[in-house]
Structure formats: structure tokens, C-alpha cells
Amino acid sequence: VCSSDLDKQKLTIMHIDADNKRFQDFIAETEKKLDMEITVEKCPSNADNRQAKISTILASGDQNIDLISVNDEMISEFKHKGYLEPLEKNVMTEEVRDSFPQEYLESICEENGHIYSVPFQMDIMMFWVNQELLKQAGLDEIKDTGDFDILQKSLKNSDQYAYGDAWENTHVYNSLAQFVNFWGGDYFDWTDPKTQDAARYMKSMLDEKITSPAQFVDQYEQMEEKFIRGKYGCVFMYTGALGTFLDADVYGKNKIHMAPLPMFHEKKSTNIATWQYVLNNASENKDAAFRFLQYTASYEGSTEYAKIMKSYPARVDVIENEDIDLEGIDMVRKYLREYTLNARPLCENSMGAVSDMG
């Protein structure tokens, strides 16, 4: 029996992908499946404005927005504030929770025995190489730090570097955390000799001109653009950049592609991040919100999301098992199986702390 539109449950979601045609298709499919009316609203694209706007909505008890997409930085702040509905009873039950990266959930999504978000999209920090520049240096792959020197010596132009990065003050913590993990240190403990060694190694890359001093003002957009133009032999960048490289027509096994992690020091580990849904405590449509979240957190919903969006879902079992037509999925599976996955080191004042460290 078809329910009339009057009886349909309604839901309003503020979402980072509101303008994305694929996401609109996913929502249309979900509306049919759940027999629900879903309105999607845009959020600001600039990270600081976005955090400020969402913070205001939640703090003011605004009832017009039910679900909001947030990143690691936002959940790290909001989960302490009492604005969010806990989800462990209705959505993120033990069984569902087991399908997500465990250490990540504990570190990012949970607080005081409650779980406050449902991750839907996973970003994994991958090692990307420009195969043309490696080939020119006589290398098949970059296995260790010695290969950086070989690569650097083979580069023809003074504005080309073996390694590229984004060291602008709001971005550098991604790389700091990555290198500290390689050295087995602790980002929150700068008295730890391993932490110090990791930072010293990054400084030595600069001193030995393996990486560019110009990147102190670069965010990911600038780093990606230089990488696309053949200025860098390799970079660390999240899987989310895949679309950018595909659109620029530089992705491929003989061009720019994801590669196994080199052995820098003692550990092979990498950062992961997600986009996740949170439920506004002030929402008057909690039943509808729970149904939507149960679906997106489920194996079926997560698979549907990955197939329509062509991006990696947050459920590890879906990435492992499903026949998802995603470039580079075999390399992503290798990372999930063989390397330690770390949440980035974020604290309650996440945005401020990240910039201060930078």
C-alpha cells in the first residue's frame, strides 16, 4: 500500500555533497527504499566557515536540521558539547560497529562510552608516485629513503623535487602525524626521541633539497596541482584525490598512481579519516533519522553508497568484499590488510590545536 505524502516521514540533512549529482542519486534511491522524504541542504565549502555554521546550528538548538555530515575535526569538538544524540543503542550496535575500523571509532567517534556518529565515507592517506619520473631515475618503486636521493639526482629542473607536501599551518599536521607514526613516536609527546627524530627527518628533507621550501604556504589543492604538472616524484595524499587526478587525465600505472608504502623507519602505518553523520539532539524527526542511519550504516546501504558515489565507504567489509568499480581498489585493500590504520591526532579544540602546531 502506497502511503500518501502526508504520512511519509520527513528528514533534513545538511551535507558536504549536497551539490554532487551522484549524491543526489543516492538520496533519491534511499527515499524510495525507505519511503521517506529527504531534503538536502548545502553547507559552506570553506572548512572554518563550515565548522562555525554547524556549531551555531547545534548550539542554538535549531530544529530545522536533523542530520549533518561532519569530518574528524568537527566530531572531535562536538562530541564533548552535549549537542549530539548518542547512537550506540539504535544504530551503532556492537554488530554494526565491528565492521568499521575499530581504533579509529574509539579515537574519533566515541566519548564517555557513547558513540556519536556514523562514518559513511573513508579517506585513506596513500603514497602516490609519478611513474614517469621514477622511470627516468631507473626506479620501479620507492622502497626507502635512499630512493629519494636517487630520484632527486635524476630530476632535470630546479623546481622539481623527489617529494612534495602541503606544509601550510592547517595542513602540516597530516604529514607530521604520518612521519611520527613511521618513526614509532607520539604526536602528543615531543619529548619522545622518536617523535623528535621524525621531525628532524622532515627538516633534513628540506635541507637536502629533496622537498620544496615553497610548500610552507601550500594546502592540498596547490600540492595536487604541482604533482599533476610533474613537479613532484611522490606525495602523501588521501584517496579522495583520485577524482582530481582522473579529471586531469594523469592517473594510470605509467603516470600518477597509488603505490605501497616505503619503509621510512620502523613502522608501516597510515592515517585514515572519514566523513560521518551526526544526529542533532534538537531534531524532532529522530525516528526517521534512526531509520536513515541504520540503512547507511548497513552492509547494503554502504554498498549502494559506494557504487553510486564511486568513493570508498567507511565499512571495511564492503571494501574487502564487494565488486565495487573503483580505480585503485586493490591497492586500497593492500593498505587495509597490511598496514596499521591510525586516526589522526585530534583533540577537543581540534582546528585551533592543528593550526597552533602548524
Name what the model sees in each region:
Residues 4-83, 93-97, 141, 263-266, ...:
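Conserved N-terminal structural module of periplasmic/extracytoplasmic solute-binding proteins
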Residues 43-53, 73, 145-150, 215-228:
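Short helix-initiation/N-cap motifs at beta->coil->alpha
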Residues 5, 256-259, 307-356:
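Long, aromatic- and glycine/proline-rich binding clefts that accommodate carbohydrate-like moieties
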Residues 72-126, 149, 157, 175, ...:
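Hinge/lid segment of periplasmic solute-binding proteins
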Residues 28, 32-33, 42, 59, ...:
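Extracytoplasmic/periplasmic substrate-recognition and gating elements
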Residues 73-83, 102-141, 166-188, 199, ...:
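Periplasmic solute-binding protein
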Residues 152-156, 188-219, 261:
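Glycine-centered hinge/linker elements that transmit conformational signals in sensory
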Residues 66-69, 233-238:
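Paired acidic/hydrophobic, glycine-rich loop segments that form the ligand-binding mouth/hinge
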